[in-house]
Swiss-Prot record:
It catalyses: N-terminal L-glutamyl-[protein] + L-leucyl-tRNA(Leu) = N-terminal L-leucyl-L-glutamyl-[protein] + tRNA(Leu) + H(+); N-terminal L-aspartyl-[protein] + L-leucyl-tRNA(Leu) = N-terminal L-leucyl-L-aspartyl-[protein] + tRNA(Leu) + H(+). The lineage of its organism: Bacteria, Pseudomonadati, Pseudomonadota, Alphaproteobacteria, Hyphomicrobiales. This is Aspartate/glutamate leucyltransferase. One of its GO terms (biological process) is ubiquitin-dependent protein catabolic process via the N-end rule pathway. Its EC number is 2.3.2.29. It is found in: Cytoplasm. It comes from Methylorubrum extorquens (strain PA1). One of its GO terms (molecular function) is arginyl-tRNA--protein transferase activity. Keywords: Acyltransferase, Cytoplasm, Transferase. Belongs to the R-transferase family. Bpt subfamily. Its main location: cytoplasm. Functions in the N-end rule pathway of protein degradation where it conjugates Leu from its aminoacyl-tRNA to the N-termini of proteins containing an N-terminal aspartate or glutamate. GO terms for cellular component: cytoplasm. The keyword Cytoplasm applies.
Length: 248
């Protein structure tokens, strides 16, 4: 087990492994533990510096020969919705997203498993057990919660919640300058609803309602079809060597 002081971040470098996004490339990551009294502050600083959170770990790519992974964040106040994105919102008008504590549930894991098997059957997460899922959701020392999307029911106007099994779920961190979508998944049988795009659009609305300037989407990877969608939310800022650069 790696030992580390509780309030002083120590950074480590992973061994090379096959890149999950670009064939023929190897990835390495630099990471640190988000623990102790300063975990929340450290997560804020590192996210603004291009890191991503996974449980109590913050990491960013540190590949030797490739710089394709670029951290992106949507400029919420200036976001310009496209016609196709507006239609996606209309298509999912009967969904209600409810913020809930970051506690795992069996119905979440059932949806998560179906999503992985259908969309990422060859990915590194495909063997995650229910315990692994619980750790992904619960294991955190930062301000985080779930947004669980369900269909609108007859009493939803009264209590503000959807009914039935979840259609989509997002684990969301709350930062001083924005929301960060840590991980999201959805019903693979509802592909025509573009639920991944819908959750991003909904989180843009949530960030705006909270008065937060950014929505952090993680890494856009040029040349990766899996990550192309992140370039469709503009204006956005991309973290370059000179700092955050606006892209219209």
């Amino acid at each position: 087990m790696t030992s580390h002081p509780r309030d002083t971040p120590q950074f480590y470098l992973t061994a090379p492994s096959p890149c999950p996004y670009l064939p023929g490339q190897e990835e390495r990551k630099v990471f640190t533990h988000l623990v102790g009294r300063r975990a929340r502050d450290l997560n804020e600083i590192l996210t603004q510096g291009g890191f991503r959170r996974s449980q109590t770990i913050a990491y960013r790519p540190a590949c030797e020969t490739c710089r394709a992974c670029v951290s992106v964040r949507v400029v919420v106040e200036d976001f310009a919705i496209t016609g196709s994105q507006r239609r996606i919102l209309q298509r999912n008008a009967e969904l209600i997203g409810t913020p809930e504590p970051n506690r795992p549930a069996s119905e979440q894991y059932a949806l998560f498993r179906r999503y992985l098997d259908a969309r990422h059957g060859d990915g590194g997460m495909v063997d995650m057990t229910v315990l692994d899922y619980a750790m992904m959701i619960e294991d955190s020392h930062v301000d985080t919660h779930l947004v669980v999307y369900r269909e609108r029911g007859p009493d939803s106007a009264i209590h503000g919640r959807g009914v039935g099994a979840p259609v989509a779920v997002c684990l969301t961190d709350v930062l001083a300058d924005g929301l960060s979508m840590v991980y999201s998944f959805y019903d693979p049988d509802e592909a025509s609803r573009s639920l991944g795009t819908y959750m991003i659009l909904d989180h843009i609305r949530r960030a705006r309602a909270l008065g937060l300037p950014y929505l952090y989407l993680g890494y856009w990877v040029g040349g990766s079809r899996k990550m192309d969608y992140k370039a469709k939310f503009k204006p956005q800022e991309r973290l370059m060597p000179q700092g955050w650069v606006r892209v219209e």
